[in-house]
Amino acid sequence: MAEQSCEVEQLGKKVTSSDVAKHAGVSQATVSMVLNKKYNVSFSREVIERVEHSAEELGYELPKRKRKRESRREKLLVVFCPNLTNPYYVMLLQGIEARATEQGYGLFVCNTQRSLVLEEQYLKMLSSLNPRGVIYTCNPSRCYLEMIEELSKTIPFAIINNQNEKLEVDAVELDNLKLGRIMARHLLDLGHKKVAYIAPPLTVRQKQRSKRVEGFLKEFSEAGLANGVVIKSANESIDQDVPGIDSEYRIGYDLTKEVLADHGDVTAIVGLNDMIAFGILDALYDEKYKVPNDMSVMGCDNTLFSKMRKLSLTTIEHFVIYKGRDACDIIMKKIKSADQKYGEIQPISIYHVEYEPQIVVRGTTSYAKTK
């Protein structure tokens, strides 16, 4: 009789979890946890069966989650990062997030750690994440360029430092050839004729690193000092391992020790980036060299630490935070244009932004010491 009255009461109205709770003699929270299989609390078999039986008898169905995919898309940007141990990438993220927050967007950061496997996994996740845009803070791996070009037909992509890559997507660019030349010209103007250049692995995957070195070598070559540059790059295995928090610093430190042991006539050492330059400085300090009196040192990126008085690192400014903001602005423009029609057709545009690299001369470079 009780069961009949229960059924009658449900006629003409939607059954709720509260109805199931009353029928089963349990709390509404218990109904929710049991039916959603969230056993945060240990329920007896008898309670589980009672709840399930009541739900079935009353014809109760769990409410389908209304996924407003478009509203989700309007709030999410995905950012690919090769590592988070270098302040350069943190600065880029800061610029991206500052602009995204202004526009009401959140970020999903994919730290690939320069792993092809991780990069592929994250790319395949894009369909489920359903972002409104994707930003790469470095060049994508070459083996995924076709995939990215295909994805960019439906999701706006912006790539930072994409110059010279054959990829038709929006980009915030850096001319690494020019940057390398600026570094070399500064040292040549100070009379340095024998210098060392320390870099992470110079592989096909990391083409932009090689471009920076190439520009440096060209400037020395045109000055008649083609043999005046010693290139020291880390083993390729460095990029295949998960980067340690001090991996780039260690590259600078360890390879400087090798330079000092093998090339006693060097008067300046250049790091491909500031993190490597910090390692160079510490290695010189440990070997009792005075900077810049005995050895000049340069870095690149003008990160926060390079400005500290005790370091005062000569470096290259290429406006990292601004580049992050610009990449985000490009995505916002693409989103806006996708929501607008120009007559009967959809406009297609490719944005390219480039900043001129500039030298910031501080206390680690000076005139070459006569040896």
Predicted regions and their residues:
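Flexible loop/hinge segments that line or gate small-molecule binding clefts
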Residues: 137-182, 198-202, 275, 301-313
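Flexible loop/turn connectors
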Residues: 257-371
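An alpha-beta-alpha
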Residues: 183-225, 344-364
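Short beta-strand segments enriched in small/hydrophobic residues
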Residues: 23, 28-33, 69-84, 195-202
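Hydrophobic alpha-helical segments within soluble ligand-binding/sensing domains
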Residues: 170-198, 214, 218, 249-258, ...
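Append "Primarily bacterial transcriptional regulators
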Residues: 20-22, 51, 295, 359
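N-terminal helix-turn-helix/winged-helix DNA-binding helices
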Residues: 5-16, 55-88, 92, 103, ...
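Short beta-strand elements in bilobed, periplasmic/extracellular small-molecule ligand-binding domains
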Residues: 101-111, 217-249
